[in-house]
From Swiss-Prot:
Localization annotation: Cell membrane
Entry coiled-coil feature ranges: none
UniProt GO BP: siderophore-dependent iron import into cell
GO MF annotation terms: transmembrane transporter activity
PANTHER family: ABC TRANSPORTER PERMEASE PROTEIN MJ0876-RELATED, FERRIC ENTEROBACTIN TRANSPORT SYSTEM PERMEASE PROTEIN
Alphabetically ordered keywords of this record: Cell membrane, Membrane, Transmembrane, Transmembrane helix, Transport
Major localization class: membrane
Family as reported in the entry's similarity comment: Belongs to the binding-protein-dependent transport system permease family. FecCD subfamily.
Topology in the lipid bilayer: Multi-pass membrane protein
Transmembrane segments: 4-24, 59-79, 99-119, 124-144, 152-172, 196-216, 249-269, 284-304, 322-342
The protein's role, per its UniProt record: Probably part of a binding-protein-dependent transport system. Probably responsible for the translocation of the substrate across the membrane.
Name used for this protein in its record: Putative ABC transporter permease protein MJ0876
GO cellular component: plasma membrane
Amino acid sequence: MNKVGILLILFILSLILPFTALYLAGDTHLITVKDIINFLLKGTTGNEFKDIIIKDVRLPPIIGAVLIGLTISVAGLMLQTLFRNLLASPYTTGISSGVLMVVALVIFIDSLSHLFEIFGEKSILVAGWCGGIFSMILLIIIALRVREANGVIIVALLLSYFFMGLRAYLIANAEELKIQEYWGFTIGSLSKITLGDVIPMTICSIIFIIGVMFLIKSLNALLFGEQYAKSFGLDIKKTRLLVLFFASFITGAIIPYVGLIAFIGIIAPYLARPLIKTSDHRYLVPATMFLGVILMVSCHILSLKYYLPIHYLYGINRPASPLPIGAVLDILGGMLVVYLVYKGEKKIKID
């Protein structure tokens, strides 16, 4: 099958799955397929209670999953192309670490907690945005000071470990309730997304996708190496800064809403390359987007339908608890990549 045919199939799947998730994400006897169709076409099911469940409980997490799949996966692809490293992602380049660091400071340090109290329930969200801006500025400074792309990722990774150490110090001296609050942010969950959150997330996603479209030609030039790209007149420094800016921008905009969902930025590009059998970003970017949506929505369904048997694992009398989507994605994605590498069927290269 040619590349366009594969993209069409992925596109159709990425459209069908969110609608399927709307039906499966809860009691299927309470809300039927007909209710879902009526709500999507008419804006109401004819039942106020069902409307509230769909609008406030089921719909926001699914839209969040779609937006994360569309954006964070492509942010990972851009960083992998820039650094010519399949492990490059918003997490491994330190972008997520900056967000987590600022959130940790706000949660664990009382003076900062009081300062952010003016934002009420959105204090952690605002802290995450500040962390995103901090990460963006830090990465741009590194990119301006370090000439080689590999040097940038090494410095960013070292800073990521530095932030990890600081967070460990803060956690070691923190109260249990604050540790639980921070842990709840880091594991990655779509459950806290509200319909009001969807609007800024969508706006940021649109800005990011438009930016990526303008960078496709430059990303293709980088496939042949920076020296080769320079010979074709590509401004390497400008391209590097733009890639880092957009990757930091979307990570800082999305992560505060959902916590740490990092692996999608590695696994979606990894699976897209052998599937469409090309490194041309004209095809690779949409393939990564569609795969990102498929993976995120599928993991969202699994996280709601399957529960972790806490009482069997730890021998304690507690009800089974839903799996956070970040854990589902990491477990299934990790096993899939290990299987593909072990079988030797997917020999992936950047160029």
